[in-house]
A protein has these predicted regions:
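FabD-like malonyl-/acyl-CoA
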Residues: 1-134, 180, 257-286
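Alpha/beta catalytic cores of group-transfer enzymes, especially the acyltransferase/condensing modules
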Residues: 9-11, 36-39, 93-238
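Non-catalytic positions within long, well-ordered alpha-helices that form the structural scaffold/packing
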Residues: 248-254
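Short, flexible loop segments at boundaries between secondary-structure elements
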Residues: 279-303
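Acidic, low-complexity mobile loops and tails
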Residues: 305-354, 361-363, 369, 398
C-alpha cells in the first residue's frame, strides 16, 4: 500500500521549483494556479528569496501548487496525507476538491493566517528530545501551545516570541529548542481569526467523498466524508497537527511505501524513525520520477471503501475502520448476540458491528474472507470516523 504525503510550511527553500518547471506543461499549470493564488508562483519558486517565500501568504500556495504539480506526474496512490497546509494538497489528490479550489482556499488560508500573525509577534520552535509528557507539560507551563506533535522526540511549540525565548532559555530536561522559519504561531489559538475567514471561504466549495484513503491531521483518522473533511480542514488552522497519529494510522492500515511530494525531506525524515520497514522516497528533483514510478508499481494496491483496507496485495493483517462517528455496538442487528470472537472466520460482507448515530446505525462489515484476529474497541465505546475497529487476517495467512 502506497501513500503520498505533502509537506507543510517550512519545507520550502529558495529555487526549489526551478528543476520541476523545466518539464513539459508544468510551468503552464503553475502559471494558471498563480492567478488563483494572486502571486507569481513561478517567480517565487525559482528566484524568490528566503525571506519572500517564508511569508505565510506566499509559502502556503507555493507548497500546495508544488505538491499538486508533482502528484500529477505520477500514478494514483492508495492513500494521501498532508502536514498542515499540505492537507489541502492531499484533499485534492484524494478527489475531495479540485486542484483549483485547493489553491483558492490555500490563498485565503495563507492570507488569513498572515493577518492573524500581525496582531502580535508570535512564532514556533521545535522541541527535540526529552520525555514527551514532560515536554508537553513544560510547554503548557510556559504559556505556549503544542502546535505539532510530529513523533517521538519532536514536538513544536507555538506562542508569543517573548514566551518562546524564555522557554528556549530554560528547556525541558533532556530537550533542546530550535526556532523555526515560520511567520507565526500556527495551529494555536492565535489563529482563531483565520478559522473564521477560511470557514466563510469554504462555504459553497464543491466537495466529494475521498476516492482513496485520506488521513486527517486532527487525530490521524481515516476520513471518508468530504463534508466532514471540509469541517476538519477549517478547524485545523487553530488546532494541533498530530502527525504522530497519522503515522500510527499509516502503520495500522498497512502502508508499505511512502512518497513525500516536492519539496520532500521533512516528512520522510520523521517516517524513518516511526515507520521501520516502509520504503521511503523524498521527491526533490525530476531525476527521481522514475524511482517514484517504480515504487508505485511495486507497492500500489486498491482500497476498498470506508474500510480503508488494502486489497490485491498480500498483507499480514488488515484494518476495518469506523464509517462515521458515534457509539460502537458489536454484533449484527439490534438484539442479536455480541461481538464475533477473536479467531473466528468471517466472510466478505459479514456484519461485524454497527456505529450508532443519531440518525440510525451504520454497519461495519468485513471487506473480504478473513480471520478476525483482534478487536481494537469494546462494545459501547465512543468512536470517531476512521478510527480502527478490528484487525482481519487473510485466511490463507491465518
Amino acid at each position: 500500500m502506497l501513500i503520498f504525503t505533502a509537506p507543510g510550511q517550512g519545507a520550502q527553500s529558495p529555487g526549489f521549483l526551478s528543476p520541476w518547471l523545466e518539464l513539459p506543461d508544468l510551468a503552464e499549470q503553475v502559471g494558471a494556479w498563480s492567478e488563483l493564488a494572486g502571486r507569481d508562483l513561478i517567480a517565487l519558486g525559482t528566484t524568490g528569496s528566503a525571506a519572500e517565500i517564508t511569508d505565510t501568504s506566499v509559502a502556503q500556495p507555493l507548497l500546495v501548487a508544488a505538491a499538486l504539480a508533482v502528484a500529477g506526474l505520477l500514478g494514483e496512490p492508495d492513500a494521501a496525507a498532508g502536514h498542515s497546509v499540505g492537507e489541502l494538497a492531499a484533499g485534492a489528490i484524494a478527489g475531495v476538491l479540485s486542484p483549483s479550489d485547493a489553491i483558492r482556499l490555500t490563498r485565503i488560508r495563507g492570507e488569513a493566517m498572515a493577518e492573524a500573525t500581525a496582531a502580535e509577534p508570535t512564532g514556533m520552535a521545535a522541541v527535540l528530545g526529552g520525555d514527551q509528557a514532560a515536554v508537553l507539560a513544560a510547554i503548557a507551563a510556559a504559556g505556549l501551545a503544542a502546535a505539532n506533535i510530529n513523533g517521538a522526540g519532536q514536538i513544536v511549540a507555538g506562542g508569543t516570541l517573548t514566551k518562546l525565548e524564555a522557554f528556549a532559555a530554560s528547556p525541558p530536561a533532556g530537550a533542546r529548542v530550535r526556532p523555526l522559519r515560520v511567520a507565526g504561531a500556527f495551529h494555536t489559538p492565535h489563529m482563531a481569526p483565520a478559522v473564521e475567514a477560511l470557514a466563510a471561504a469554504a462555504t459553497g466549495t464543491v466537495v466529494k467523498d475521498p476516492a482513496i484513503t485520506l488521513l486527517s491531521n486532527a487525530d490521524g483518522a481515516v476520513v471518508t466524508s468530504g463534508r466532514y473533511w471540509g469541517e476538519r480542514i477549517v478547524a485545523q488552522v487553530a488546532a494541533p497537527v498530530r502527525w504522530d497519529l497519522c503515522m500510527e494510522t499509516m502503520s495500522d492500515i498497512g502502508v508499505t511505501a511512502l512518497i513525500e511530494l516536492a519539496p520532500g525531506g521533512t516528512l520522510t525524515g520523521l517516517a524513518k524513525r516511526a515507520l521501520p520497514g516502509v520504503e521511503l522516497l523524498a521527491l526533490k528533483t525530476p531525476d527521481q520520477l522514475d524511482a517514484a514510478r517504480e515504487l508505485i508499481a511495486a507497492h500500489a494496491a486498491s482500497t476498498n471503501g470506508y474500510a480503508a483496507v488494502p486489497v490485491g496485495v498480500p498483507a499480514e493483517w488488515r484494518i476495518v475502520v469506523a464509517p462515521g462517528g458515534g457509539t460502537f455496538r458489536s454484533g449484527g442487528k439490534e438484539g442479536e448476540a455480541g461481538a464475533v470472537a477473536a479467531g473466528a472466520t468471517v466472510r466478505a460482507g459479514a456484519v461485524l458491528g454497527h456505529v450508532v448515530q443519531r440518525g440510525g446505525e451504520r454497519p461495519v462489515t468485513a471487506s473480504h474472507d478473513a480471520v478476525l484476529t483482534e478487536w481494537l474497541v469494546e462494545d459501547g465505546d465512543p468512536v470517531g470516523e476512521g478510527q480502527p475497529l478490528v484487525r482481519l487476517e487473510p485466511e490463507e495467512q491465518a
